[in-house]
Amino acid sequence: MPDDCSILLINGAQKDITKDELKMIKTYMKNGGKMYVFLDARVENLTNLYSLLQSYNVEPQKGVVVESDASKYTQYPIYLLPTIESSDATSAQYNNNVYVLAPSAKGLKDITEKNAKKDSSASDYTVTSLLSTSDGAYSKVDTSSSTLNKEKKDISGPFDISVAVSDSSGGRMIVTGCTNMLLQDIDQAVSGANTDFVLNGVNYLAEQKSKISIRAKSLKTENAVVPAFNQKATLIMTVFVLSLIHIS
């Protein structure tokens, strides 16, 4: 691990970290290190990486999150519009009428209570939700299934899609269960709000006092993000009004 490493980035690991790398990362974090982890929902069997996250009270769930609340997704139930929670890392976007878009995301669970039953040091780590689903969300374990309907082996929510973890030694970590957020077309769909979310997370990790906030946008027309519920309601109203006009 370089001595001048300000923030360690693990971006959509396709294979597991080694045991030696696991030890190095743990030492780095115990010395006040900062880490940003993006998880690819399609990749499982990351035993050492998941072990690291679980030791920080964050448990990645198998599969891809499916949202049942039509106000929390757009186009498809796996195109999530998660709730932006109140936190130091999200203060610029919280309650600011902003959507972030997280397609094909992996759910995260706060397992602080579970870990505390086995290890009293679990309380040294504080998990804060940054992005969350509705209570009706579930994780589709079989990602090759022909249906998005909830099946017996699927995992019930709610889930966090992104969390921040701080520890008593000064270490900080953000774990986000989506690698697609910064794809250009996905980010543009929410007028750069995904980039703002990530940059504010970096700002939080770096413990900068000045907020990155919401970056200035160009004069181009911004995309209007419409949750699926609103899309359906608009369609119903349009059909109803047009029907009345036709009848009259």
Predicted regions and their residues:
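Acidic, S/T/G-rich, low-cysteine, solvent-exposed domains in lumenal/extracellular/periplasmic regions
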Residues: 1-210
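Conserved small/polar residues in nucleotide/adenosyl-binding loops
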Residues: 245-247
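Short, aromatic-rich amphipathic segments at membrane interfaces
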Residues: 213-237
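C-terminal target-recognition/interaction regions appended to catalytic cores
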Residues: 240-241
